[in-house]
């Protein structure tokens, strides 16, 4: 099984990591902007477009909580995807 990797989004003003499955960006984990200090400061998003029209995500108190939630969502999403879904994303990238 292909391992998930993360790469820092250098264009983001806040800490943000793009998550990759092979060469396909399947989501992100990053600090939220414009939220009060007492609110969850992190967010995660799992899914990609085109190819996968099912995007899930949510807030998290810490990076580790966001990562755990992302990984759980990915484990549910991955079995529903085909190689054609990943190829659709590659085609729009290239």
Language-model features, listed with the residues they occupy:
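Intrinsic disorder/low-complexity segments enriched in polar/charged and small flexible residues
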Residues: 19, 44-46, 76, 91
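Short aromatic-glycine-(Arg/Gly/Cys) micro-motifs in beta-strand/loop hairpins
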Residues: 31-56, 79
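Short N-terminal "domain-start" leader segments
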Residues: 1-41, 67, 83, 94
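A short, exposed loop/beta-hairpin motif centered on an aromatic-Gly-Thr core
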Residues: 48-65, 73
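Long, contiguous binding/interaction regions
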Residues: 34, 61, 87-89
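Short arginine-rich
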Residues: 71-85
């Amino acid at each position: 099984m292909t391992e998930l990797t993360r790469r820092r989004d250098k264009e983001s003003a806040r800490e943000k990591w793009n998550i990759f499955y092979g060469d396909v960006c399947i989501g992100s984990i990053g600090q939220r902007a414009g939220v009060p200090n007492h609110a969850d400061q992190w967010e995660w998003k799992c899914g990609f477009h085109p190819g996968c029209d099912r995007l899930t995500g949510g807030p998290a108190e810490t990076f580790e909580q966001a990562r755990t939630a992302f990984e759980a969502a990915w484990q549910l999403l991955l079995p529903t995807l085909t190689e054609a879904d990943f190829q659709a994303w590659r085609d729009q990238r290239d």
